[in-house]
Design a protein with these regions (language model features):
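Pepsin/retropepsin-fold aspartyl endopeptidases
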Residues: 1-132
Length: 132
């Protein structure tokens, strides 16, 4: 079994000052385009979410009839299109369904679908551990 360990990242919080969050620097790719991006590892997110600019960089295509709205915590709905991309975590690359946001103001989220069933993911002592 192999492990990839990411230290939590310290970030500013309006409520708590400094907090440590589970962020993993992962490679996301589509065809010949790839980018190293900091994803929040979010066990509460159904899908992996990427902002409009990243999907555009990856050459994802918009189809008006495929736009749907998703909603997380809070009342705001976000228009997205579901697409496939590859994510590499350590030495393992998997294809995942991503929700490509058609707005920019969304965080990069690594959600459960296609990810959590390919890895054992452990949140422990300010570290995120991926085992495969």
């Amino acid at each position: 079994m192999q492990e990839v360990i990411f230290d939590f990242k310290e970030q500013d919080s309006k409520m708590f000052g400094k907090v440590r969050r589970p962020v993993a620097d992962l490679v996301i790719s589509n065809a010949d385009k790839k980018a190293l991006m900091p994803f929040y590892v979010d066990s509460g997110a159904d899908l992996t979410l990427v902002p409009k600019s990243l999907g555009t960089f990856l050459d994802l295509k918009i189809a008006e009839d495929e736009i749907t709205d998703i909603q997380g915590v809070g009342a705001r709905q976000v228009p997205v299109i579901l697409r496939k991309a590859k994510i590499r975590i350590g030495g393992k690359e998997i294809e995942v369904t991503i929700a490509w946001s058609l707005i920019e103001e969304v965080p990069l989220l690594l959600g459960r679908k296609d990810v959590f069933d390919n890895f054992e993911i452990i949140f422990k002592e300010n570290k995120t551990i991926f085992r495969y």
